[in-house]
Amino acid sequence: MKATVLAGLAAVIAAQGVAGHATFQQLWVDGEDKISACARLPLSNSPVTDVNSAEIACNANSGPAAEKCTVSAGGVVTVEMHQQPGDRSCDNEAIGGNHWGPVLVYMSKVDDSATADGSGGWFKIFEDTWAPAPNSNSGSDDYWGVKDLNAHCGRMDVPIPADLAPGDYLLRAEVIALHTASSPGGAQFYMTCYQLTVDGEGSQSPQTVSFPGAYSPSDPGIQINIYQKLTEYVSPGPAVIEGGTTVEAGTGGSTIPAN
């Protein structure tokens, strides 16, 4: 009987994990839906789990997109995540299965965003991570970036820093799911890279990190038990750059109406 119960529980957990797989698929620029024109879509909705893999940059098997999306420095892009390719229904969670964790966005200055391979330097422009909920005794009951994403049809508004130098960039949108992250290798990384051209007259050229290299499996924001009471959450990777955006979890999302 005990073995049967344990096997059943394992099956439920496994099914929950698969149900929660997702990808960032679409992009909006200042409220205009660009669909997936400039998204380097992964071939599956499965996560990357090895932070030392080359796939941690722009996901697995993600070839160049059809186009580049143009945005002005100081403008807003909206990244959009869903569980299944082509499904933009707001009736389904963007990423289900209690895949709580942060939403992080990076950019990389490149010569040509249509051909860049993601191996260049990255800087963080946005994060919506964690905040404590009143009377919570478990991190899973707290506020998370993923919960903000789910509450807004998978969409998250991401301001482009106003002083960013013009040119081509890759934009890397990422969810780190922490539901099985209490041991090394348990965190799940869901990312997509978008091909951008940034217009403007800025001059900001931030310091960068590399993917792989920016994360370690034992980083406190990657190896963490979110089912215990949390008093803090340390966001993985570098700090958000000057002029970037840090959103308090529970307040993030998008102003684009649900369809």
Curated annotation (Swiss-Prot):
Q: Which GO terms describe its biological process?
A: cellulose catabolic process
Signal peptide per UniProt:
1-20
Query: Which residues does the record give as O2 binding sites?
Result: H179, Q188
Keyword list, A-Z = Carbohydrate metabolism, Cellulose degradation, Copper, Disulfide bond, Metal-binding, Monooxygenase, Oxidoreductase, Polysaccharide degradation, Secreted, Signal
In alphabetical order, the GO MF annotations are: metal ion binding; monooxygenase activity
Tell me, what's a Pfam family for it? AA9
Q: What induces it?
A: Expression is up-regulated during growth on wheat bran compared to that on glucose.
Which protein family is it in? Belongs to the polysaccharide monooxygenase AA9 family.
How cofactor binds (record note)? Binds 1 copper ion per subunit.
- InterPro entries of this UniProt entry? AA9, AA9_LPMO
Q: What is its EC number?
A: 1.14.99.56
Function text: Lytic polysaccharide monooxygenase (LPMO) that depolymerizes crystalline and amorphous polysaccharides via the oxidation of scissile alpha- or beta-(1-4)-glycosidic bonds, yielding C1 or C4 oxidation products. Catalysis by LPMOs requires the reduction of the active-site copper from Cu(II) to Cu(I) by a reducing agent and H(2)O(2) or O(2) as a cosubstrate.
Localization (cell): Secreted
Q: Does the keyword Ion transport apply?
A: no
GO terms under cellular component: extracellular region
Q: How is it used?
A: Lignocellulose is the most abundant polymeric composite on Earth and is a recalcitrant but promising renewable substrate for industrial biotechnology applications. Together with cellobiose dehydrogenases (CDHs) an enzymatic system capable of oxidative cellulose cleavage is formed, which increases the efficiency of cellulases and put LPMOs at focus of biofuel research.
According to its UniProt record, this protein's enzyme class is: oxidoreductase
Q: Where does Cu(2+) bind?
A: H21, H99, Y190
Task: Indicate what this protein is called per its UniProt record.
Answer: AA9 family lytic polysaccharide monooxygenase E
**Reaction(s) catalysed (UniProt annotation):** [(1->4)-beta-D-glucosyl]n+m + reduced acceptor + O2 = 4-dehydro-beta-D-glucosyl-[(1->4)-beta-D-glucosyl]n-1 + [(1->4)-beta-D-glucosyl]m + acceptor + H2O
- PANTHER family attached here? ENDOGLUCANASE II, PUTATIVE (AFU_ORTHOLOGUE AFUA_1G12560)-RELATED
Q: Does the keyword Membrane apply?
A: no
| Cofactor(s) needed | Cu(2+)
Paired cysteines (S-S)? C69-C193
